[in-house]
């Protein structure tokens, strides 16, 4: 009998995410700015529906297209974006969103409360976190053209944090687009209120965006994802370049202005290149995802099996496979990351990276594991995930778990996870 364990790998890493190499032209503000910007992008997103997909490749492109009623600032605090003002009662069950007037969608129509309510009601039925707080069919209601309300059955102090979460983002689009959306493939039209509008998607080649001349920015300066997102260039084209060495070569040859996900052993190629700059950003490399829904028939339903896996893992060795240069990785129990100061905690230290084969075998013997095959799912588009999975396979086999690794493309893996 085959059981299944869907798997990604987690370490907290400091990742070199972007290289910028650009020739410049002069803008009307007197600053040197290139007007047609090109990016070599590592992964083609499965869709450009901000609410339906969990893909970071989609999220980072969608942030130019869509906005939310609130967005996260640089300190990971939610701030009004399409909302002008937000009010709530003392127990955080009744929320009122007063919308900014005159905000236009990319088709030229004005955003109204019916669009916001439709978008947020769809979000609340899809987003996993939203389902934890909107459990009993509560709905966002239209009070007037510029006011949306919701009454929660359960108090939620963190409601705005859920709304501002960039994963499965509560991006606002037209009511008609929400109503026509497909439950699997998402929105049929890509229209938001963001600083750039969608122009063209040529599969396996590029996604092109264009500056939205009628963009209505909030008064606050840009901080994180919140505030004025006005761009000072005309077009932004994301070219799908899966191979990391090809992205590097393209940057060095001035084929692309920006390149993401530079491999650690390629960074020295930019030493002395005066028109290029490296930007480093912290991000999390996935996490182990167990299929453990009650009744699914997976070994992962058993807490002792999961404990056995935890003690079998040597995170240090996994990290070496994922990030060869130790200068760019931090191993930490903190799920959110120390850079998110509001959420930083060491609560998991007692259980994290406690590699102990004897304890692992002890828990495995107490579990329901009967010698069957555990399946791990991974992909090669993200080398850190693939390389880490192979190390985990060896570590689990070392305590007597039979492991089969299934490799698929990232879009298919996301579908399996969802």
What are these regions (language model features)?
Residues 5, 196, 326-366, 380-385:
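Structural transition elements
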Residues 40-90, 121, 191:
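N-terminal lobe/hinge region of extracytoplasmic solute-binding protein
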Residues 41-59, 82-83, 109, 157-169, ...:
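A structural "hinge/loop" feature
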Residues 74-77, 166-235, 245-246, 358:
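Gly/Pro-rich hinge or "lid" segments in bacterial periplasmic/extracellular proteins
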Residues 91, 132-178, 195-202:
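Surface-exposed binding/hinge segments that line
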Residues 217-269, 402:
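Ligand-site clamp/hinge motif
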Residues 299-340, 384-388:
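Periplasmic-binding protein-like
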Residues 361, 365-418:
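Ligand/substrate-recognition segments at binding pockets and active sites
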């Amino acid at each position: 009998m085959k059981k299944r364990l869907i798997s990604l790998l987690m370490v907290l890493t400091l990742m070199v995410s972007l290289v910028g190499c650009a020739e410049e032209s002069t803008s009307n503000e007197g600053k040197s700015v290139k007007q047609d910007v090109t990016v070599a992008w590592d992964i083609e997103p499965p869709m450009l529906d901000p609410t339906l997909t969990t893909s970071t490749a989609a999220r980072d492109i969608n942030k130019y297209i869509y906005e939310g009623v609130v967005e996260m600032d640089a300190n990971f605090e939610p701030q009004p974006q399409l909302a002008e003002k937000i009010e709530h009662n003392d127990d955080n069950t009744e929320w009122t969103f007063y919308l900014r007037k005159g905000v236009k969608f990319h088709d030229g129509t004005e955003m109204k409360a019916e669009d916001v309510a439709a978008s947020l009601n769809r979000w609340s039925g899809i987003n996993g976190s939203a389902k934890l707080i909107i459990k009993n069919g509560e709905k966002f209601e239209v009070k007037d053209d510029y006011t949306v309300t919701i009454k929660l059955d359960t108090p939620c102090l963190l409601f705005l944090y859920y709304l501002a979460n960039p994963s499965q983002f509560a991006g606002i689009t037209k009511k008609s687009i929400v109503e026509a959306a497909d439950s699997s493939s998402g929105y049929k039209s890509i229209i938001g209120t963001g600083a750039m509008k969608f122009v063209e998607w040529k599969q396996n080649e590029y996604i092109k965006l264009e500056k939205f001349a009628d963009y209505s920015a909030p008064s606050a300066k840009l901080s994180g994802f919140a505030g004025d997102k006005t761009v000072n260039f005309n077009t932004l084209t994301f070219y799908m370049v899966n191979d990391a060495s090809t992205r590097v070569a393209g940057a060095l040859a001035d084929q692309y202005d920006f390149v993401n996900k530079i491999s650690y052993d390629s960074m020295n190629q930019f030493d002395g290149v005066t028109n290029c700059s490296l930007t480093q950003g912290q991000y999390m490399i996935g996490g182990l995802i167990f299929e453990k829904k009650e009744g699914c028939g997976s070994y992962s339903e058993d807490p002792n099996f999961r404990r056995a896996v935890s003690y079998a893992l040597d995170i240090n060795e996994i990290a070496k496979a994922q990030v060869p240069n130790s200068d760019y990785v931090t191993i930490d129990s903190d799920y959110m990351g120390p850079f998110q100061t509001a959420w930083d905690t060491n609560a998991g230290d007692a259980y994290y990276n406690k590699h102990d084969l004897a304890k692992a075998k002890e828990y495995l013997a107490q579990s329901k594991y009967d010698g069957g095959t555990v399946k791990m799912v991974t992909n090669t588009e993200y080398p850190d995930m693939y390389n880490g999975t192979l190390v985990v396979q060896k570590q689990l086999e070392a305590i007597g778990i039979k492991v089969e690794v299934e490799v698929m493309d990232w879009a298919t893996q996301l579908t399996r996870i969802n």
